[in-house]
Amino acid sequence: MQYYAAPMEGLTDRVWRQAQQKWFGPEGTAHRYYAPFLSPPENRVLIKKKMAELAPAANPGAPVIPQLLAKDGELAAWMIGELRALGYTEVNLNLGCPSGTVTAKGKGSGMLRDPAVLDAFLDAVFSHAEGPISVKTRLGVSSPDEFAAILDIYDRYPICELTIHPRVMRQLYRGQADRAAFAEALPRCTMPVCYNGDVTTPEELHALETQFPQLSGIMIGRGFIADPALLRRARDGTGASREELRGYLDDLYHGYTELFGSAGCAVSRMKAHWFYLIHRFAGSEKLEKQLRKAREPWEYEVLVNQIFTLPML
């Protein structure tokens, strides 16, 4: 069974990918790391700063898979060609993002509203692009019952792997992932299938492997940010030590400071990571509130020192 790191905007960037592999590899390393989505520019002029995220030299270690968020199939195919020129083989199409700002433009899971539009998009992509193309999807817009028609469209194209997040667009990330609906859909899929959604512990990971042994992979998102040693725990039972977690977080902080050219901007990015990580420390509620309000680097650094005096859970 392959384990993948999910693309999460503002979290699973190259700074995180490097720090996670450094501190928790090789046993804690994912087989693949899916990069947060890129939107191909309509003028077909690439922005150097955005493309730096996918520069091969900035992504040593396990394979990285770029993800595209688009609604123009020919434009997406052009971008796939640009990514191939950088040395990437597989490219992933994001048909699952439920964010309102994305779906309002007919992108992400907004593409699932109209099967004809979805079909035309995929036809344009696969007619003009070469090489392996995977897809990340949801079950539908408002009901899992929509997935049968969506899958009929996916079956028309040589999708190398289909990652299914078993929620619908309107759920966002509320409620539970619908594993019953996933179990119903899986036997109907003709392409390799990866599961994604609510995998936060080694026990949940192993339960999925047992329930769905035919999966090609399991993709982990928020659970990986909350516990960067999750895969190591799943493989050999070794959790993150206090020293490892501190080194990992310090590398993130310094990496973001260098990337943004500002420790203040790094603090904002670190608070996104701490949103998931803070619950690893017992009695952290008061410090969590203070951390949310922190603006200055010195405030952040003092609070992190205080957090690391607490017992780890």
What are these regions (language model features)?
Residues M1-L313:
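Flavin-dependent oxidoreductase catalytic cores
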